[in-house]
């Protein structure tokens, strides 16, 4: 069993909405098969019961536990600690866990992704061709399923430089909605 140090962002927005806070270190005994979300739950249970973290399914189906782990956008429920160990070279230094940087901070690891749902409501359905003899083939139905596999984790928006570095939320819908429009277009 490894004893690993985690550096976790703790903070909240100030009056202007800018995040203020600090990285706080926690040392956790890892069990075999743990994922990052298990670590967060252990920190909540043993050291920081007020650590805010959003999660729901713990199966990579809902996207609620999106965060940045060692600078990479990931689902905490699907990020195995064994993989982190391999990437870091046997846990050299603390494992860094931060909220998604493209979205407004609510508290600690929780961000406000409501913007995405507001944009989604603005997208109108697209109807099929006007031709009454138009046939929807199986290969078209199969292709749509590819686009519908998106779990709305918003990690693609978090990594998009237009959204992350330039904060163009009013001018650009972002990558998530290109996928949404593509699924409607089919």
Segments from the language model and where they lie:
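Intrinsically disordered, low-complexity coil segments
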Residues: 14-21, 82-94, 166-173
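Well-ordered beta-strand positions in beta-sheet-rich domains
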Residues: 23-27, 76, 94, 161
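Local cysteine-cluster metal-coordination motifs and their immediate loop/turn environment
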Residues: 51-83, 145-165
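Ferredoxin-type iron-sulfur electron-transfer modules in oxidoreductases and energy-metabolism complexes
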Residues: 34-46, 95-186
